[in-house]
């Protein structure tokens, strides 16, 4: 086996990717496209379980498919696990949306979609811990956008969130979104 970063191009699908701390690649299998994220086994299993539980609550997230473990390179050294999720058809990361000529109010509509997602997640007891435009995918929904959670590795599903947890997510969202929009305005697409 090979680290995900060295998989041959003929196995991969060239789709727009957001910014990630981890190696993420898209693979075509049959009629479906899957996102592969290389992370530690514990994080992969925890994120898989969180996404599965959020899906059962009918919240807008990517669909978790599997965690691939027990991988080794040709020298027998262990490789990180891979979290496999189903790619959300027709979705785009925010940077890909801004790379196109869009309406001037696009940023506002994306932030609105992210706010709706965060409220829905909070009402279900999900503490995100890393709210940002980078951790969601967007689908066009008539004249607006819908946001879908793609990165749940810092999250936690609880019975109820504390006021402090909600405030932290809101403050972090504000900070991260300002930074992401500043990056875009400086031309750092």
Where is each model-derived feature located?
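Catalytic activation segment of kinase domains across protein kinase-like and atypical kinase folds
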Residues: 127, 133-183
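Conserved ATP-binding subdomain of kinase catalytic cores across diverse folds
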Residues: 2-108, 112-129, 145, 176-178, ...
């Amino acid at each position: 086996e090979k680290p995900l970063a060295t998989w041959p191009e003929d196995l991969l699908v060239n789709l727009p990717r957001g910014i990630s701390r981890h190696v993420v690649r898209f693979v075509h299998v049959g009629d479906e496209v899957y996102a592969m994220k290389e992370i530690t086994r514990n994080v992969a299993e925890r994120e898989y379980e969180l996404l599965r539980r959020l899906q059962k609550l009918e919240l807008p997230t990517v669909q978790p498919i599997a965690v691939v473990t027990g991988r080794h390179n040709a020298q027998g050294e262990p490789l990180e696990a891979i979290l496999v999720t189903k790619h959300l058809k027709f979705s785009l990361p925010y940077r890909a949306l801004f790379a196109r000529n869009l309406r001037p109010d696009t940023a506002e509509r994306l932030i609105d979609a992210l706010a709706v997602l965060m409220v829905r997640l909070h009402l279900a007891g999900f503490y995100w811990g890393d709210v940002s435009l980078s951790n969601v995918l967007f689908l066009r929904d008539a004249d607006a956008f819908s946001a879908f959670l793609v990165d749940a590795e810092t999250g936690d599903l609880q019975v109820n969130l504390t006021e402090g947890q909600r405030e932290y997510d809101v403050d972090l969202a504000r900070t991260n979104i300002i930074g992401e929009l500043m990056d875009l305005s400086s031309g750092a697409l």
